[in-house]
Amino acid sequence: MNIILMGLPGAGKGTQASEIVKKFPIPHISTGDMFRKAIKDETDLGKEAKSYMDRGELVPDEVTVGIVKERISEDDAKKGFLLDGFPRTIDQAESLSQIMSELDREIDAVINIEVPEEELMNRLTGRRICEKCGTTYHLVFNPPKVDGICDIDGGKLYQREDDNPETVSNRLSVNVKQSKPILEYYNNKGVLKNIDGSKDIDEVTNDVIDILDHL
């Protein structure tokens, strides 16, 4: 079972990824984890990726694609994988198709967790952090007992700069633009499965598992 997990920031991908790998014996492979592992293992591609990252440059597609191929060829991914954070471009999606073809495998489903942008804004801008102890709150899902004050030590709560509405809105716009052609690509291949991510977490999980059970 070879799965790609997609969704905008705040859609709950991390939560659903955890539930999927609990239910199915496949590794959760995120782009960040892949890079860290390749660099730690000092593979040729890992060293090459590190040289770009150390210079503050974007890692070229051919290096990223090579690292993906190495990772999904490992023993723990032979029965399947859950890929998160890749592909990000049509070129990467086509490269992944080529890799899967070389490995005589295919992508079984692309799970896209859909949440209205307004709801994502609420989720992403509601985070507050205690300036003393670092405890995280959420104005909607996990509010402090007293507005603006930490329950634990009475510290003042603040909003991180990248959680402010303007930054979040820009981030969502970039992600929508980036993901649209990839979703169309997989829809044309007949493997795209859209999930309503605005439901309760357990309901979303049940919907995801139901799709995967029927592959």
Curated annotation (Swiss-Prot):
Catalyzes the reversible transfer of the terminal phosphate group between ATP and AMP. Plays an important role in cellular energy homeostasis and in adenine nucleotide metabolism. Pathway: Purine metabolism; AMP biosynthesis via salvage pathway; AMP from ADP: step 1/1. It catalyses: AMP + ATP = 2 ADP. Pfam families: ADK, ADK_lid. Residues 126-163 are annotated as: LID. AMP binds at T31, R36, E57, L58, V59, G85, F86, P87, R88, Q92, R160, R171. Keywords: ATP-binding, Cytoplasm, Kinase, Metal-binding, Nucleotide biosynthesis, Nucleotide-binding, Transferase, Zinc. It comes from the Bacteria. One of its GO terms (molecular function) is adenylate kinase activity. Its EC number is 2.7.4.3. Belongs to the adenylate kinase family. PROSITE patterns: ADENYLATE_KINASE. The gene is adk. Consists of three domains, a large central CORE domain and two small peripheral domains, NMPbind and LID, which undergo movements during catalysis. The LID domain closes over the site of phosphoryl transfer upon ATP binding. Assembling and dissambling the active center during each catalytic cycle provides an effective means to prevent ATP hydrolysis. Some bacteria have evolved a zinc-coordinating structure that stabilizes the LID domain. Monomer. Residues 30-59 are annotated as: NMP. ATP binds at G10, A11, G12, K13, G14, T15, R127, T136, Y137, K199. Zn(2+) binds at C130, C133, C150, D153. This is Adenylate kinase. HAMAP family: Adenylate_kinase_Adk. It comes from Staphylococcus epidermidis (strain ATCC 35984 / DSM 28319 / BCRC 17069 / CCUG 31568 / BM 3577 / RP62A).
